A protein has these predicted regions:
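Soluble non-transmembrane domains of integral membrane proteins
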Residues: 1-207
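Helix-loop-helix
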Residues: 58, 71-93, 147, 162-165, ...
């Protein structure tokens, strides 16, 4: 991160050198400085031991007698390789279900996936006042949350020189008057996809916890699981309780299915008799079966349809279980069994 300067600036910068270190019980700050004949740039990086946020502030001072044209920028890079441990059979590793790659949140789309293949073909560029960008992994992410009051340009591209992919933010153009200074700040998040932590940085950052296309079902399930965890203090039992809750909610559908299957079992002898009687005439057998269903008030579809209607709920719950970092290595019972 830093500043992009116009042609009127001497680009012969010294390398960043540490100038100051400040430590306290809640924040550790490190100040780095570099300068050229025209400008002096300071970078202040602040860490808080209790969370995963990094606050970065850049200060630029014009040392010349000319106006300097500049823009701020911040970016993160990665290669195209999958993180260690994500290779293997599709059904063998939950990480293979997770989206790994760049994400942008802007005013036009608060959660937009732009995979590495797309950046191979075309750069991403979009103006927005609010938003963030990140690289996602299965349980972790690295995100840039810029100033939310000015227009920024969110960018993503592949560097053809080093074959690395980058996402970042470029600030609006500014003019720095002679012997004056300006600054810009942004936040970084390096850590697990813990929704309660992500929401502290940006209201849309919890969307990085990706429960797939059934997010609208999965998110309430996670909130229910969080509620039960707060009650019992154990994620394993929270999963059991959510499973029971889902079964209770879906019981009317299950009841219809079980009732229909019970009726089908009762008329099995009659169906078998019809099949033997009309074994040589499929049309007659079909008509006889339809008449039997009507007389006995049996709908064969009611045995399968309610089960199909329940599938999205169980699929969404599966996505929640494999995508929630709080469950990673969490003890189930007496700390002897881990999820």
């Amino acid at each position: 991160s830093g500043f992009v300067f116009g042609n009127n600036v001497n680009q012969d910068f010294s390398s960043f050198k540490i100038e100051d270190i400040k430590r306290s019980s809640d924040t550790n700050s490190y100040t780095f400085v570099r300068e050229s004949a025209s400008v002096k740039e300071s970078k202040i990086i602040s860490f808080q031991p209790e969370n995963y946020f990094v606050e970065v502030k850049h200060i630029i001072r014009n040392l010349s007698s000319e106006v300097i044209n500049s823009s701020s920028y911040s970016k993160i890079e990665r290669n195209s390789l999958k993180p260690p441990g994500t290779e293997g059979a599709f059904f063998g590793d939950p990480a293979n279900f997770a989206y790994l790659g760049p994400v942008f949140s802007t005013e036009s789309d608060n959660y937009q996936k732009v995979n590495l293949g797309e950046l191979e073909e075309n750069d991403f560029k979009e103006n927005s006042i609010k938003g963030w960008t990140a690289f996602l992994e299965h349980y972790f992410l690295t995100a840039i949350i810029p100033d939310q009051e000015n227009i920024n340009v969110f960018v993503g591209k592949k560097n053809k020189t080093n074959e690395k992919f980058s996402v970042g933010v470029v600030g609006r153009p500014i003019k720095i008057q002679p012997f004056e200074e300006t600054s810009f700040s942004y936040s970084l998040y390096f850590g697990p996809k813990v929704q309660s932590e992500l929401s502290k940085a940006n209201q849309d950052l919890p969307l990085a916890v990706d429960y797939g296309f059934l997010y609208w079902i999965g998110q309430p399930m996670f909130l229910a699981m969080q509620f039960f965890y707060d009650m019992v203090g154990n994620w394993g039992w929270a999963i059991v309780l959510v499973t029971l809750l889902i079964k209770v909610i879906l019981w009317p559908l299950s009841y219809v299915s079980y009732k229909s299957m019970g009726k089908m079992r009762q008329i099995q002898p009659q169906l078998k008799d019809l099949q033997e009687r009309h074994s040589g005439d499929r049309q007659a057998m079909s008509q006889a079966m339809m008449k039997l269903y009507k007389d006995e008030k049996v709908n064969p579809a009611l045995g399968c349809l309610p089960m199909l209607l329940q599938m999205p709920f169980f699929l969404a719950f599966y996505w929640v279980l494999i995508g929630t970092v709080e469950l990673r290595y969490a003890p189930f019972m007496l700390s002897l069994i881990h999820i």
